[in-house]
Amino acid sequence: MEKLAELGINIPSFIAQVVNFGLLLGLLYLFAYKPILAKLDERSARIKESMERTDQVKEQAQRAEEEFKKKIGEASQQGQLVIERAVKTGDEIRQKAIEEARAEAEAMLSRARTEIRQERDEVVDQLRKEFAELTILAAGKVIDQSLDKKAHQALIDSVLENSTNLRKN
């Protein structure tokens, strides 16, 4: 102990300091260390909970994004179907308009042909009548007598019919 005294260490003072240090450690343990550890544990739990919530939010965001992409894909497909239907309907309407125009043109051509045929027949009949009258007049002048118009007309019609039949063949 003397050696400790030579070094300047006072034993009663040293013991008092060790006791004081032990008491201080005990008090700090009770009043500071436990509350600090409790606060740290609480903070750790909050951080862990926040991390879990963050993971959940990320998962929800990912699911929402996938659902959004899926809905966009479905909307795109529906849009394509609508476009295809519209194109098909447009083609059908165009085709129908073409067919109606074609039918109308054919009907107009048919009417025009019928009218032309009727007018031609009328002109031919009129020419026959005029030709017959001219023939009667000419024949009457040539023989200086007037023939029976009905008999002469029948003769001219017969000649004209024969000439028309010859032209058709």
Swiss-Prot record:
Oligomeric and partner information: F-type ATPases have 2 components, F(1) - the catalytic core - and F(0) - the membrane proton channel. F(1) has five subunits: alpha(3), beta(3), gamma(1), delta(1), epsilon(1). F(0) has three main subunits: a(1), b(2) and c(10-14). The alpha and beta chains form an alternating ring which encloses part of the gamma chain. F(1) is attached to F(0) by a central stalk formed by the gamma and epsilon chains, while a peripheral stalk is formed by the delta and b chains.
SUPFAM superfamilies linked to this entry: F1F0 ATP synthase subunit B, membrane domain
Primary localization class, coarse: membrane
GO cellular component terms given for this protein: plasma membrane; proton-transporting ATP synthase complex
Keywords noted in UniProt: ATP synthesis, Cell membrane, CF(0), Hydrogen ion transport, Ion transport, Membrane, Transmembrane, Transmembrane helix, Transport
Family: Belongs to the ATPase B chain family.
Known role: F(1)F(0) ATP synthase produces ATP from ADP in the presence of a proton or sodium gradient. F-type ATPases consist of two structural domains, F(1) containing the extramembraneous catalytic core and F(0) containing the membrane proton channel, linked together by a central stalk and a peripheral stalk. During catalysis, ATP synthesis in the catalytic domain of F(1) is coupled via a rotary mechanism of the central stalk subunits to proton translocation. Component of the F(0) channel, it forms part of the peripheral stalk, linking F(1) to F(0).
Superkingdom of this protein's organism: Bacteria
Transmembrane spans: 11-31
Subcellular location(s) per record: Cell membrane
Listed InterPro entries: ATP_synth_B-like_membr_sf (IPR028987), ATP_synth_b/b'su_bac/chlpt (IPR002146), ATP_synth_F0_bsu_bac (IPR005864), ATP_synthase_B_chain (IPR050059)
A matching Pfam family: ATP-synt_B
Signal peptide: none
GO molecular function per UniProt: proton-transporting ATP synthase activity, rotational mechanism; proton-transporting ATPase activity, rotational mechanism
Organism name: Dehalococcoides mccartyi (strain ATCC BAA-2266 / KCTC 15142 / 195)
Membrane topology per record: Single-pass membrane protein
Protein name: ATP synthase subunit b
